[in-house]
Amino acid sequence: MSSTPITDRDTIQTWLDHPTGGPALRGFLERAGSDVDQLAPAYGLPLGKLVDLSGGKMSQEAIDAIVRDANGGEIPVAAEQSASATGHRFEGKTLIITGAANGIGRATARRAVAEGAKVIATDISGDGLASLAEELGSGQVITVTADLSDAAAVDEIVAAADGQIDGLANVAGIMDNFAAIHEVTDEVWARVFNVNVTGLMRLTRAVSARMLENGGGSIVNVASEAALRGSAAGTAYTASKHAVVGITKSMAVMYAQAGIRTNVTVPGAVATGIAVPKDVGEFGNERMTSYRPNIPAMTT
């Protein structure tokens, strides 16, 4: 056993460089018929994140076995790693957060609650929202299971805020199938735009009207690196995220004097659990393959 314990909170790169962790991880992958090269995009992530990223192919029990192998049969107690809140910026505020069941949306909800907010958490995953409410406490989280592609969902989400809406984080989004434009079907185009653009527009339309009545608020839209370049996804997703940036720019101008602050963030690869359809566009996916090694390592 190494004199320096290693846990599932350490990054995969740290594991590979560790005197006992490296052999333990490589040995596990070899027995599973895999190798470390397949983990290259995730080198910067904690080992434990592989449970979520693998879609169930790697269990927590398997991760624990690797940790024990690297630590002489024991699982060391990990140091507490939690981001400290910077205060109570959201005390008395009500925030709506879409895509709150996992990934960026869930992390946003955690931080908002930690800083005193009442959160209206919405997502299509009822199970994910239930676990979020259990984690954060039902007193500060109201969950609304809703599909943003359904126009009726907007009324339900806004009603849950009970009149006061101080902030909106438009995080929810879905991926396309990497299809180039000559491969894009009407179904894929409509599905991506209904959630990423039309759903965002409908909810923001309702929320901004409420904010105008109440004297202001703050809206943050989550786009993607696909809003900055054409080599991150297929045509439908890329176009949808460019649209999100366009909506944000328009709102920033329209409401600058009305007390509504609007911003957009364009994250790179993040372990969000966003599903990628299996029916990938052959031409587009082949083109994207050559660009993937240039994408910065995934983060959480």
Q: Which sequence ranges carry the predicted segments?
A:
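Catalytic Tyr-X3-Lys loop
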Residues: 182-201, 216, 220, 244
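Canonical Rossmann dinucleotide-binding motif of NAD(H)/NADP(H)-dependent dehydrogenases/reductases
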Residues: 85-118
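Residue(s) in the substrate-gating loop at a strand-loop-helix junction
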Residues: 224
